[in-house]
From Swiss-Prot:
Signal sequence annotation: none
Chief localization: cytoplasm
Cited PANTHER family: UREASE (PTHR33569:SF1)
Catalytic activity field: urea + 2 H2O + H(+) = hydrogencarbonate + 2 NH4(+)
Disulfide bond sites: none
GO molecular function: nickel cation binding; urease activity
Species the sequence originates in: Synechocystis sp. (strain ATCC 27184 / PCC 6803 / Kazusa)
Name of the molecule in the record: Urease subunit gamma
Pathway: Nitrogen metabolism; urea degradation; CO(2) and NH(3) from urea (urease route): step 1/1
InterPro entries named among the record's database cross-references: Urease_gamma, Urease_gamma/gamma-beta_su, Urease_gamma_sf, Urease_subunit
Subcellular location as annotated: Cytoplasm
Family classification: Belongs to the urease gamma subunit family.
Length: 100
């Protein structure tokens, strides 16, 4: 299978988000990479579903709360930026303060 660097990145994000989802489901608090992967994958899937950039910016800030991540993670993550493919092309989605 021949994958572009962008496709490899998306596959890595998806794989890391699966680990994060399973840990979250078991009641474990997510660390920094898991939180980033969890939010990023949700944004990528939302773009694939046809949601708008504005919708995803708002949605991304509702995915995780401070209680679901390890101490210090919200402060380490002032924003998440994801380059997502929409029906009309690739756009950068920025979620400010994604963990509230």
């Amino acid at each position: 299978m021949q994958l572009s660097p962008q496709e490899k990145d998306k596959l890595l994000i998806f794989t890391a988000s699966l680990v994060a989802e399973r840990r979250k489901a078991r009641g474990l608090k997510l660390n920094y990479p898991e939180a980033v992967a969890y939010i990023s994958a949700a944004i990528l899937e939302g773009a694939r579903d046809g949601r708008t950039v504005a919708e995803l910016m708002n949605y991304g800030a509702t995915l995780l709360s401070r209680d679901e991540v390890m101490e210090g993670v919200p402060e380490m993550l002032p924003e998440v930026q994801v380059e997502a493919t929409f029906p009309d092309g690739t756009k950068l989605v920025t979620v400010h303060e994604p963990i509230r």
